[in-house]
Swiss-Prot record:
InterPro entries: UPF0210. Homodimer. Pfam families: DUF711 (PF05167). Transmembrane segments: none annotated. Belongs to the UPF0210 family. It comes from the Bacteria. It comes from Carboxydothermus hydrogenoformans (strain ATCC BAA-161 / DSM 6008 / Z-2901). PANTHER family: UPF0210 PROTEIN MJ1665 (PTHR37560:SF1), UPF0210 PROTEIN SPR0218 (PTHR37560). Coiled coil: none annotated. This is UPF0210 protein CHY_1509.
Amino acid sequence: MFNFGEILETLKMIQEENLDIRTITLGVSLLDCVDSSIAKTCENIKQKIREKGQYLVETAKKLEIKYGIPIVNARVAVTPVSLLAGGFTETETVKIGYALEEIAQEIGVNFIGGFSALVHKGFTKGDINVLNTIPRVLAETERVCASINVATTRAGINMDGINFSARIIKETAERTRDKDGLGCAKIVVFANAPEDNPFMAGAFHGVGEADYVVNVGVSGPGVVKRVVEKIPGADLEELANEIKKTAFKITRVGELIGKEAAKMLGVKFGIVDLSLAPTPAMGDSVAEIIEAMGLEYCGAPGTTAALMMLTDAVKKGGAMASSMVGGLSGAFIPVSEDMGMVRAVEVGALNIEKLEAMTAVCSVGLDMIAIPGETPVSTIAGIIADEISIGVINGKTTAVRIIPVPGKKAGEYVEFGGLLGRTVIMDVNRFSSEKFVMRGGRIPAPIQSLRN
């Protein structure tokens, strides 16, 4: 049980160190919603989400009051729409996107994920319908998020899927030019996408999941930073141990809220995602944790080692606190959402290549990176391919959320607002990868995929 000292410690984490529940995400299976009529299908989708989703925001508010911990977002993730869209046209598939937007507005969630396609080994008609309509849907809605899984360790890398994704990103940026390409902040390209991820924009509800599931994401970079700052003379073993103990405490909060939310909604509890998720708020930064360990700036030599230690310690502590750990679970390094990352880019300590190296040891990948709007599609495809290959060879989730900002060049600033923050536009390698990426086809699965 909790003692009085632990209660006071938790209150301090909330009041002074930005500890919060980043998201309570309700996963909803839409597999039973398909009808021969698109109108009926859309109505079925809205009714299925409404059945439990109408109580989600209210439940989050009640838990905030009961436990005194901020719950920042209530969200919904649905079955990948490509699994529903095979019997429809592209025009009809767009209507599914509109239906998701309408129900998200009705129940009051700020994002709904799952306008997604799983194309790691090839394309179905439903996949093509979704991929061709992502730019339009994201430009014409505010809350719908999309994701594309282009590779797995077992299947290899679908290079045609990567090229398709790069074109989608470029078109989405153009369609949302008046918002500096903001639509691209709602697209994630994955390797080894998890089916129970509570975080946007990459959340979708996997086919192996129950009808309804609650998954929770906790955010505590500020708490971890304070712990690191308290022991400046500690060696790395002691430092890792203190981070581990802190992650244990953070995760207990997440599991408590998640199980209570599931009980109140009358659904199954899924997982706690352990990921340290930064925000643009002062002191709520993963980069600042790394700098508190002794690096002048995030990106300096030693950054990847520090991030590896941080991620591993968080996982060990979190796994001790909850048996139901899943999603992405590690540390996020979204550039625009982390003030420390933005500062590191500004001074030249951090570039895309260093971020790519860091993704080999952390939770996700190249996240919320703004690049010049004139960047060729082939270069975007090459960047995605590099990142995806790290995930495939290491058997882990990696992803790319990249924003080619129309009309802007490297060194200029872009403001996305809210949790998406602001950032400086990063330079990209000027040499061409077009001949390589245009070969297309599939990169075979690595030898470590043969595990049976």
